[in-house]
C-alpha cells in the first residue's frame, strides 16, 4: 500500500494501483490542488516521498462528462496555436474553449502534411501536452495514447481520475484493468457505486478501516429496531452518509439531512419514521 501525503498527513491510500475517494468535499479539495500540475506548477502533495509536479506527473481527468472532453492540459501556447492554425487551414472546426474534437490520427495526419513529413515519428506525449484542451473520441485513441505516454521516461506517475458512470458513457470500462506501476486510478464514489466484498476503503476521521460493504450493512441492520427493514432503502441511506462523508462532523450533517427527508415523507408511517431515524443514530 502507498500513501499520498498532503499537509503532512496521509491523505489518501492507494491499494492495488487504485484509490477510492469517498467524499466529494475531500475530492474537490484534493482535485483543486493536484490539477495545478496541468498548469506546470508544483503541488504540496507527496507520493511515496516524492513531490508531485508537472515534470513527473500527468493528470487525466475523466471524472465528469465535461472534463472528459478536455482530457489533457498544458501551458505550451506556441505549439497549441500552431496546431489550431494548421487545423483552421484545412477547414476543420473546433469547439469553444479550444477543445479539438478530432482523433489523434486525424491531427497527426494534418501535422504530417503541414510539415511535409513522411514516416516520421512524432512524440505523442509532447503533442498531447501542447494542447490547451484535447478531446479523444474513442477507446482506441485513448489507449493508443495512454500506451505511448507510459513509455515516457520523465513521467513517473499517471493519475487517471474517473467515475464508473463516466467510464460507461465513454465506453472505457477497460480502464479498470490497466496494469502498470505508473498508473494510479482514482475512483470517485457516489451513492450509485457498487462494491465487491473487500473492495472498498472507508475513511473515518484520520483512522482508516477496511471493512466489507455487506458486513457493514449487516452490522447496522442487526441493531435496527425495524423488523425486516428494506435493505435497498437502507443501503440508499447508508450510501448517502458514508460515500459522501469522511469525518464525524460530515456524518452528523448528512444524518440530519436524511432525518429531515424522512420526516417530511408522507409515504412512511409515523412509527416507521421514528424507528428509521433511530437506526440512523447507529451509523
What label would you give each PLM region?
Residues 88-140:
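Conserved P-loop NTPase mechanochemical-coupling segment
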Residues 125-172:
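Conserved helicase/translocase P-loop NTPase motor core
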Residues 36-46, 154-155, 175-187:
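Structural alpha-beta junctions
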Residues 1-74, 264-283:
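Glycine-rich P-loop/Walker A and Walker A-like loops and their local beta1-loop-alpha1 context
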Residues 171-243:
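The catalytic "switch" region of P-loop NTPases
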Residues 10-11, 19-21, 221-283:
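Preference for solvent-exposed, low-hydrophobicity sequence contexts
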Residues 21-26, 160-166, 188-190:
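Structural motif
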Residues 16-20, 156-160, 184:
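Residue-level preference for the first positions of well-ordered beta-strands
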Amino acid at each position: 500500500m502507498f500513501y499520498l501525503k498532503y499537509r503532512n498527513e496521509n491523505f489518501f491510500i492507494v491499494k492495488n494501483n487504485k484509490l477510492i475517494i469517498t467524499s466529494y468535499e475531500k475530492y474537490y479539495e484534493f482535485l483543486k490542488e493536484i490539477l495545478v500540475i496541468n498548469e506546470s506548477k508544483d503541488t504540496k502533495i507527496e507520493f511515496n516521498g516524492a513531490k508531485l509536479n508537472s515534470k513527473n506527473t500527468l493528470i487525466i481527468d475523466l471524472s465528469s462528462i465535461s472534463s472528459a472532453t478536455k482530457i489533457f492540459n498544458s501551458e505550451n501556447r506556441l505549439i497549441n496555436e500552431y496546431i489550431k492554425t494548421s487545423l483552421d487551414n484545412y477547414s476543420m472546426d473546433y469547439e469553444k474553449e479550444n477543445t479539438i474534437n478530432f482523433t489523434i490520427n486525424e491531427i497527426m495526419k494534418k501535422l504530417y502534411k503541414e510539415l511535409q513529413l513522411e514516416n516520421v515519428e512524432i512524440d505523442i506525449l509532447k503533442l498531447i501536452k501542447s494542447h490547451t484542451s484535447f478531446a479523444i473520441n474513442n477507446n482506441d485513441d485513448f489507449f493508443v495514447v495512454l500506451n505511448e505516454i507510459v513509455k515516457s521516461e520523465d513521467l513517473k506517475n499517471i493519475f487517471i481520475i474517473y467515475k464508473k458512470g463516466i467510464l460507461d458513457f465513454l465506453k472505457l470500462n477497460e480502464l479498470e484493468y490497466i496494469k502498470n506501476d505508473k498508473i494510479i486510478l482514482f475512483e470517485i464514489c457516489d451513492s450509485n457505486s457498487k462494491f465487491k466484498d473487500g473492495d472498498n476503503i472507508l475513511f473515518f476521521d484520520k483512522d482508516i478501516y477496511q471493512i466489507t460493504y455487506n458486513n457493514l450493512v449487516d452490522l447496522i441492520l442487526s441493531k435496527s429496531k425495524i423488523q425486516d427493514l428494506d435493505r435497498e432503502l437502507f443501503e440508499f441511506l447508508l450510501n448517502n452518509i458514508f460515500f459522501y462523508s469522511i469525518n464525524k462532523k460530515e456524518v452528523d450533517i448528512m444524518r440530519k439531512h436524511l432525518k429531515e427527508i424522512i420526516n417530511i415523507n408522507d409515504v412512511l408511517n409515523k412509527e416507521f419514521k421514528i424507528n428509521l431515524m433511530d437506526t440512523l443514530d447507529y451509523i
